[in-house]
A protein has these predicted regions:
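N-terminal membrane-targeting hydrophobic helices
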Residues: 1-168
Length: 168
């Protein structure tokens, strides 16, 4: 995917995730949409910073970088949705492009992708981006309903019960 595809994904995610978090469709939904926009776009564009240095789709396109970004909310509360932008960037590059990404870099240089991807110049790139974004939103909705409140990070009751039963 290219920058346009990643920004399209982030904009659609901000709209969809706002309705997942605040489904009322009132002012609160639109405020949430505005609050989500910057961290999602930031996260969606961050992995491509490695085009200016390092090895593109390796240096900032891997699981160790995602783990660091997942830890952002612990230290920087206003960046709690950046990880979603980064994770969906990875998904777009794995599912939506022919090349894939080096998920296990720097341990392995192997790039992982699926054969359904298209070239960034393909006329189908935007369509595939929208389809992948809809799947991402469906997955985020399931996480929100069944696993964790994405706005607060609080586990749902069933998950909390399972976690409470684990030996410490």
């Amino acid at each position: 995917m290219n920058k346009k595809g990643h920004v399209l994904n982030a904009i659609l995610l901000a709209i969809g995730l706002a309705y997942i978090l605040r489904p009322s469709g009132d002012v609160e939904t639109f405020v949430t949409m505005a609050e989500l926009f910057v961290p999602l776009v930031l996260g969606a564009l961050f992995p491509d910073v490695d085009t200016a240095f390092g090895r593109h789709r390796k240096t900032l396109h891997n699981l160790p970088v995602l783990a660091v970004v997942l830890a952002y909310p612990i230290y920087f509360g206003n960046l709690q949705y950046v990880w979603i932008g980064v994770a969906t960037h990875y998904l777009l590059d794995v599912l939506g492009s022919k090349r894939g990404i080096a998920l296990f870099y720097p341990l392995l240089d192997t790039e992982y992708g699926l054969p359904i991807g298209v070239t960034t110049s393909s006329r189908w790139a935007d369509t595939l981006t929208v389809v992948i974004t809809l799947a991402e939103l469906a997955a985020l909705a399931l996480v929100q309903v069944f696993l964790v409140d994405l706005a607060t990070g609080t586990p749902r009751d069933a998950v909390a019960t399972v976690l409470a039963g684990l030996p410490v």
